[in-house]
Amino acid sequence: MNGRFKRLMGLGLIVVLTAAAPASAVTVGKVLSSDKGIVAAAHPLAAAAGAEVLEAGGNAIDAAIATSLALGVVEPYASSLFGEGYMVARMADGRTWSIDFRSCAPAMASYEQMAQEGFKTTGEMKLKLQGACVPGLPAGIREVMSRGATKPLTDLAAPAIRYAEDGFEVNQTFSQICKDNFKTLSENAPDFLNEGLAWELGETFKNPKLAATLRRLAEKGLDDFYRGSVADDIDAFMKEKGGWIRKEDLQAYRAVERTPLQGRYKGYNITVAGLPVGGPRLIENMNLFENFNFAAMGWDDPLRLHIMQEVFLLTASDLSAYVGDPAFSRTAERGMANKEYAKLRLMSVKLGGATTSEDWAAGKGRAGDAPAFEEGMGLSDYLTLPAAAALPAQEQFESASTTHFSVVDRWGNAVAWTQTISGFFGTGYWLDGFFLNNEMGNFWSRPSPEGNGVSDIQPGKRVRTTISPMIVDRAGRVRWVLGTPGAGRIVPTLCQMLIDLIDFNMSLEESINSPKIMSSFNSGEGVSLMEMESGYSEGTIRALEQGFGHKVEIKKFPDLYFGGPNAIERGLFDGRLTGVGSVRRGGAAAAPEN
């Protein structure tokens, strides 16, 4: 690790709390240790909401629900009742489970409907109500509550309602994102603005409409969102403004319990969200990386960074081809997570130089044959089979505006939870105090030849994305609870964190604050593009450019583009919990005082 990176680490040690104090006795900080449970989230008040519930005797499930609802108040640009997501839980007794509350396409959604209304791409709908998918967050909360919550929803929603009614101080992230999206807000949600102006740092933001909606749901039940008065409001708004969602879509929505995907990396067990999100790609990456001795290379070694770049390019194609809603399309979750399949993909990793346009044209941009490994086939058997046709990838619109939080309680129950409305402020339209997602942009803009590709638009289909909440354990004990926003950067960022933690023995704080890289083939110069946060040595950057032939772009550390992990570490020997908030997004950790 070079000296420049060590100097950058100092940025993560300072936290400025500008939010109002929570109602209960909790401690909040950028980095915080506790043996009474802890919450790490993208906003100090959201973390405090979860810690407040822990202090009142609630468990990790209770605290997660309180944190989720609070984020919808303090991060209205990234969280909403009209949002969606995925959570993974590991109970103290070792049981793991997950809830998929991804949004889905409404009944009216189709390529024919797009064409009829003049849309050539799904991205063109992202700031229109046609870009909204049927939301899953309230249904997800309801499902999670049924699996072990000990507190009533009135208690769990109380911190969020208090923040919405009393108001809170606008932080730098809130202000900047509001300014970045001012044109959209002015056109689609002018009453969200502060007398027609963007919200400024230090101003007090209140949301009485959202407080009223939350109180209504807490008293009447979350079903009111899908079948009652809130559903009626949504239905009327969509009909008035030309959106596609109807009350019947809301009534038909269900959150789904899924078996989490399991992987293993150098002695650590990884439990991660599976279909239809980014977990299969994450496990595939780690299976490939397990073949390399990164610790011997060194953290700042250009060969290590080159290998990671090339692996990320390969697995992005597999994500595009094989990760989607299993109720609609052929998927290959088990195949992608198969270590034998990783051996096959390892044969395509270009060690000697950057991937070029010639490599891409020759087939490197195509997915591998992951479906062949779904039932446990070995590499030797596969290599004797006739060659299979690979699938091409399609590009998707995907935004970085998501949020993640992590929870561990005093009993050892752990929750990793990622939620989103896709783009910052979603469609830019808001109703009853919350913004409406624009998840339709995550579907392909044109149908696949077979008509049921993983990201083809189909009514009721859950949209694929890259979110990857995960829990890592060793010898039966939780070690880390991890996750991040960041769209296509989510899986690469989390893989880099795992390598920092396991191969380089970094602390959680060091791992979160270490500079990150991102790979894509969109450099425009015939070679792959490597985007890097500042902090790597100049010699390493020169070697990547001149020795390996990569196009390198440097972004100043810390950059929100690379996500914002909010994570928890459990001491390997003493079991003490340490929570770390993201340096890239003003995150914080909070814990009960008693």
Predicted feature locations:
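Short, small/polar residue-rich loop motifs at catalytic or cofactor-binding pockets
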Residues: 257, 399-402, 465-467
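Bacterial N-terminal signal peptides
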Residues: 10-20
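Noncatalytic scaffold domains of N-terminal-nucleophile
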Residues: 25-48, 52, 60-221, 225-227, ...
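Internal maturation/activation junctions in enzymes
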Residues: 292-420, 429, 550
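Short, well-structured alpha-helical segments that form the helix of a local strand-helix-strand
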Residues: 63-67, 154-165, 232-235, 299-316, ...
